[in-house]
Amino acid sequence: MTIFAPPARRTTTEASKTFVPLKIEEAVLVPPIDPSLPRNAFTIDVEDWYQSSLDYDAPITDRVVRNVDRVLAVLDECGVKGSFFVQGRVAETYPSLVSALVAEGHEVQAHGYSHRPLYSMNRDELRQELDRAKKTVEDAAGTAVTAFRAQDFSILAENLWAIETLAEVGFEMDSSIFPMRSRHYGIPNWPLGPHYLTVAGGARILEIPVAIWSVGRLKMPVAGGGYFRVLPRRVIERGLRSIADANRPAIVYCHPYEFNADELGEYSDVSRRVAATQGFGRASFAKRVGTVLPKLSFGRLSDVLAAWGLR
């Protein structure tokens, strides 16, 4: 068990000046023996690209519905059920989309409400954001929402106090901490496997990081999203198999818009540079996911946790 002390913070919000001590305890994993349960989780962060990436005040459009349909087509073809982390504004605008996911046997969890990064919020703002996200997604899904993933993995070293707020709002699990340093997010030297975070007062959250392949001193993100679009497929598959060999589940994520190569051409105010970087790899993304999923055992996050003895 260790106590994590954060380095210098990136934000100047008043809330970030208060450090909440976290006890970090590795979760005990029981290697799966039930072949009917998946070993790895396929998760989807459901958001509308323009609103989530360029303008937080923009309306949610039906592009998100059409893009989710593309995801479902791939999952149906692979015979895989996924976990959909749905943004609150999406659930509020298209509640029937969320209820349809549940009806088809997929799992629904929360992905914030506004898509503003959590490190830009103070404690009161964060509590309102999380509470609204949880209630909105639960109302649309008709099921309890117990897991959370922060928009853009925006729980960083300087706002780890957000874990305390997650517990206060009623979340039991989190998949927000990217366990390596990247350009815009991540915490270096963070545990790669599932672990428990205990805050002052005894509240405990199960933290489930996305897939990072550790090769000696090198850490390679094979978790999905842009990494799935940029890295060679064989590297991704090798990394995921290495995680399996290390006896821990691989948590993979993506976004519905990554399955749509034509979407960026629909915006007149998106620069060529942004379109090129955001569109890279989208044309082959669905095929890539459809190739990787059948080669490994993927399913809903709740089933994966049950397989590893964590539920």
What are the language-model segments listed below?
Residues F4, F19-L29, D34, T143-A144, ...:
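Active-site-adjacent pocket scaffolds in enzyme catalytic domains
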Residues D45, L75, H111, F148, ...:
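Conserved, mostly hydrophobic/aromatic
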Residues D55-D62, V86-Q87, S114-L126, A150-S154, ...:
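The substrate-binding groove and active-site-proximal loops of carbohydrate-active enzymes
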Residues V74-G79, V230-R311:
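C-terminal domain-boundary segment and adjacent tail
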Residues C78-N159, F171-E172, S176-R183, A203-R204, ...:
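Metal-dependent polysaccharide deacetylase catalytic core of the NodB/CE4 family, i.e.
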